[in-house]
Each structure stands twice: as structure tokens, then as C-alpha cells.
């Protein structure tokens, strides 16, 4: 399974480290020294660049919550458009609701398109090393182009029966967006759990070392008591 999952990374992930992590999860147990090497504190940086700020923003929890919220709203808008296309819900006489839904959905797509542009600018070539991000950007760009075409040629697509098919293409964007957001959140949780695990492992090692020292101290005191006849040899 790891040989497939290792390809689905997002920007900010180290592909080599990502592959190694899956192999370590399959083995389930690693030495404490190897765990220490997996988690490294970020080095102190004297000068914070715009790219650094944007990378921190893209990996922040609030940003992911906003993206998930926009994806859910987009899903509801596309669902509403599909229901009206299938005549399950009848729009108003002047067809204002479909246009409002379409413009709102196009606005959300514009936000996603800007996000993709900033990610390419911030991460550069690293962006194209992560297939999940590339797939997401392709779906966003294609969906944006199709929505623009539908905005001016909707009647032509409706006449040939392609309108519903194009709406369904947006579902691919929604599903991919949800998977990407959930995966990023999961990566953050895994990172936090690994940090907690490292702290606990360090604490256990300290306690074990302390126990060994206590046992050695007890043995030393026992020998001293026996030497001075304060403790019988049978004790």
C-alpha cells in the first residue's frame, strides 16, 4: 500500500521522507534514535521572506478550515445547479437563481485558482513533484475554463445535453478538494502525534535511567550496611 500512497503528497512534504514514513508505519516499531531523526525543529531564521509567510499560511489550521468551508459551499451550489438542470427543482420564472448559483460558484473557483497560482509561486518546482497538488490544480483550471464557457454558451451546451456532464465534472473538483484538505489535516495530526510520542519516549528513557540509578544506589547502600553489620547476610 505504501508504494501507492507515497505518490499522493502535498506541497511542503518531503517525498523521500514521506516514503520512509510509510515504511516505518508498516514496521510499527523503530528505535528511539531513528525517531529523533524524523522530527526536527525548524531552524531559526533571521529574515522571514514572503514565501515563508505564505508557506506558514498554507499549512495553518485556519486556512485549511476556510478551504474546507469553501469546498462545502461549492458542493451545495453545484448540487443546486444539478437539481435545477434535472428539473427536480424548478427555478423562478426569470431564472435568477441559476445565475446566482453559477456566479457564486465561479467566484469560489476564482479563489481556488488564485490559491493554485500562489502555491506555484511560493513552492516553485517543488509544487510539480506532488501529484495530488498537480491533479487538484488541473481540475481547478479545467473547471474554471468550463464555467466561463458555460457562462456565455450555456444554451448551446444545454442543447446537446452536455450541461449536466459538465456539472458532474465539478463534482470531481469537490471530491478532490475534500480529499486534499482532509489529507493535509491528517498530516498535521500525524506530525503532532509523532512529537508527543517522541516526548513520551524521552520521558520513559529518563525514568528508566533514573530507576537504574536508584537500583545501583540501593545495592551500594545494602553493601555498606552489610559491611558494618547493620544488615544480616540473609536479608
Swiss-Prot record:
The lineage of its organism: Eukaryota, Metazoa, Chordata, Craniata, Vertebrata. This is Voltage-gated hydrogen channel 1. The chain crosses the membrane at residues 63-83, 101-123, 132-152, 160-180. It is a multi-pass membrane protein. Mediates the voltage-dependent proton permeability of excitable membranes. Forms a proton-selective channel through which protons may pass in accordance with their electrochemical gradient. One of its GO terms (cellular component) is plasma membrane. Homodimer. Residues 1-62, 124-131, 181-235 are cytoplasmic. Keywords: Cell membrane, Coiled coil, Ion channel, Ion transport, Membrane, Transmembrane, Transmembrane helix, Transport, Voltage-gated channel. Residues 187-228 form a coiled coil. Belongs to the hydrogen channel family. It is found in: Membrane; Cell membrane.
